[in-house]
From Swiss-Prot:
One of its GO terms (cellular component) is chromosome. Keywords: Chromosome partition, DNA-binding. It holds the Pfam family ParB_dimer. GO terms for molecular function: DNA binding. It comes from the Bacteria. Gene3D superfamilies: 1.10.10.2830, 3.90.1530.30. Involved in chromosome partition. Localize to both poles of the predivisional cell following completion of DNA replication. Binds to the DNA origin of replication. Belongs to the ParB family. This is Probable chromosome-partitioning protein ParB. GO terms for biological process: chromosome segregation; positive regulation of sporulation resulting in formation of a cellular spore.
Amino acid sequence: MAKNKGLGRGLSSLLGEEVISIESEIVQIINIDKIRPNENQPRKNFEYDKIKELADSILNNGLLQPIIVDNNFQIIAGERRWRACKLAKVLEIPVIIKNLDARESMEIALIENIQRTDLTVMEEARGFKYLIENFNYTAEKLAERLGKSRSHIANLLRLNNLPQSIQDKVNENILSMGQARCLINHEHAEVIADYIINNDLNVRQTEELVRQWYKNEYTKSPNNNNKIGKRFLKDNATDNDLELLVKALSEKFGIKITIENYPLGGKLIFHYKDLEELDLILLKLN
């Protein structure tokens, strides 16, 4: 029997058999309203222009490849085609029903979609995370199943640790994966991300910026003279009110007090010479 390459390697590897041609499968014509998308599929954004282009093709040529669904008519493979048929106002479409339980259906749908080359980096990263958390995969097993390197799996999994705002920027191709990786677990990731975007830094410049930030240094971007790093935040965020507050607190406690103010928080620092002076500070605080 001929192999159906159109379904990809995902179904065949997961079902433990070669995917056979659709001529030998049972193809049924189903009302499109009975079919529902898989809520756990990694792709969350579908470009309207591409769906419209596919819808126009379906109107002219019909749906050439059936959609794969489970017993509950939940889509395993073919959501783009289903959406295009909906847009084209097609009432009935050909489907192949796979006899799978809910767990098998969900797993195969995830794997099949992750293997697509047009997922965004974050969609792929979230898919990896979901498989590991819900299907007992390890990074090594996932790499083997998907035919990807362990380092690729590990690097994408770490992107899930980024603040949501940065994940969104990666998803929208405003930040690259290389730039985003530099910001993982950084206290001021969102501030730095905005600076990277506003100053059009490349990955190497981003790496240098983060390195210097941790060293409490500053540098200048190629296109302007603004200082960046911890000193940049402190120098630009400290205003007259904070200076007056520092002066008042220093006089009240009789010691040196400094305030480091950042866009995402700050530090109030009491400087003492010895434990006796520390005791006096604590006494006044109480």
